[in-house]
């Protein structure tokens, strides 16, 4: 309202905001906070048109969604935008079960009922979901086709399903799955012996075909079973897909000052999603050459950004987040419009 009153006052003095060049309006919109950004479309028809062009562009800054603590009576999810450090958006409670994966404006979680925009799921979508150790999801925002893959069990079995499937399709249990990442229809698998497998899930039969790469990846020459195990905390190796489609191995090792990594280029690693994203200097709100964590194996509540260049940990600065208990968190890339209308496009798979 304040912005509208200000516009009316300026118009009374003969100032016509619609006469501003569209490039200037676009620059102004890019510098506004989310709440002011959405109010700006009420200035005039020109501003509304430019605003629409800005909304259609994909969001390039990772947001954090925090899920409520089951012990809390009044439960709600929180959305944190790094561009607005002290602003936290509260949205409806999506349940207290862990979120397994995310893709754009979609979430994959274990619920007793499958919900999307207030409608119950079809029978095909209400499949039994394995008790999973890791899950990944990819969704085509235009067609709404989706692929979900997961790994579970002591032998690290893996399976996947696509939109329209009524049962899980097996991924050959070759060597024990340690980590998985999914981009488009390609599934990347990191096996326990250090080998890498890639499976194209776009055109498959009941069982996926996995192409193994001949090399082995190990973090240095160490194994988790060596005598130096006590020097390591939260040993974990993740496979990450870069912007160009190559795969990147991310080793998480603490209490080892003699080991360090540097990821070159204007990119950042979003470990939740298993991808890298553009992080150039002209994108405010994301730190280049860094890794975004939403929890460590020892603590799912340990959310931070690790800057590989400075070797420093940057924790969330918002007092509203640090003062409120939560069960777990996920990084995601919502669109501006999506975050303002109480989470449409929420997709949840069911455990019956």
Swiss-Prot record:
A Pfam family of this chain: Beta-prop_KIB1-4
Domain of life: Eukaryota
InterPro entries: F-box-like_dom_sf, F-box_BR-signaling, F-box_dom, KIB1-4_b-propeller
Signal sequence coordinates: none
Transmembrane spans: none
Domain F-box: from-to ranges: 14-60
Name by which UniProt lists this protein: Putative F-box protein At5g14160
């Amino acid at each position: 309202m304040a912005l509208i009153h200000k516009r009316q006052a300026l118009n009374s003095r003969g100032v016509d905001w619609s006469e501003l060049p569209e490039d200037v309006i676009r620059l102004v919109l890019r510098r506004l906070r989310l709440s002011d950004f959405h109010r700006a479309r009420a200035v005039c028809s020109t501003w509304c048109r430019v605003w629409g062009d800005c909304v259609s562009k994909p969001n390039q800054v990772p947001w954090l969604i925090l899920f409520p603590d089951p012990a809390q009576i009044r439960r709600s999810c929180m959305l944190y935008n790094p561009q607005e450090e002290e602003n936290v958006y509260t949205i409806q409670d999506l349940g207290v079960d862990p979120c397994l994966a995310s893709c754009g404006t979609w979430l994959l979680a274990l619920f007793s009922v499958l919900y999307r925009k207030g409608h119950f799921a079809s029978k095909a979508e209400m499949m039994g979901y394995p008790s999973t150790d890791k899950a990944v999801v990819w969704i085509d925002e235009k067609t709404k086709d989706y692929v979900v893959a997961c790994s579970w069990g002591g032998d690290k079995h893996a399976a996947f399903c696509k939109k329209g499937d009524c049962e899980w399709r097996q991924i050959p249990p070759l060597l024990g799955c340690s980590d998985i990442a999914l981009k488009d229809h390609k599934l990347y698998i990191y096996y326990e012996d250090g080998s890498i497998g890639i499976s194209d899930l776009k055109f498959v039969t009941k069982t996926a075909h996995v192409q193994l790469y001949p090399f082995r990846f190990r973090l240095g020459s160490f194994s988790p079973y060596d005598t130096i195990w006590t020097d390591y905390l939260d040993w974990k190796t993740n496979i990450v897909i870069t912007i160009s489609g190559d795969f990147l191995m991310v080793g998480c090792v603490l209490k080892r000052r003699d080991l360090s990594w540097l990821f070159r280029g204007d990119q950042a690693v979003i470990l939740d999603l298993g991808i890298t994203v553009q992080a150039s200097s002209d994108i405010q709100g994301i730190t280049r050459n860094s890794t975004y964590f939403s929890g460590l194996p020892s603590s799912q509540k340990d959310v931070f950004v690790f800057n590989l260049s400075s070797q420093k940990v940057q924790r969330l600065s918002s007092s509203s987040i640090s003062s409120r208990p939560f069960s777990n968190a996920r990084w995601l890339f919502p669109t501006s419009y999506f975050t303002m209308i109480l989470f449409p496009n929420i997709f949840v798979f069911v455990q019956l």
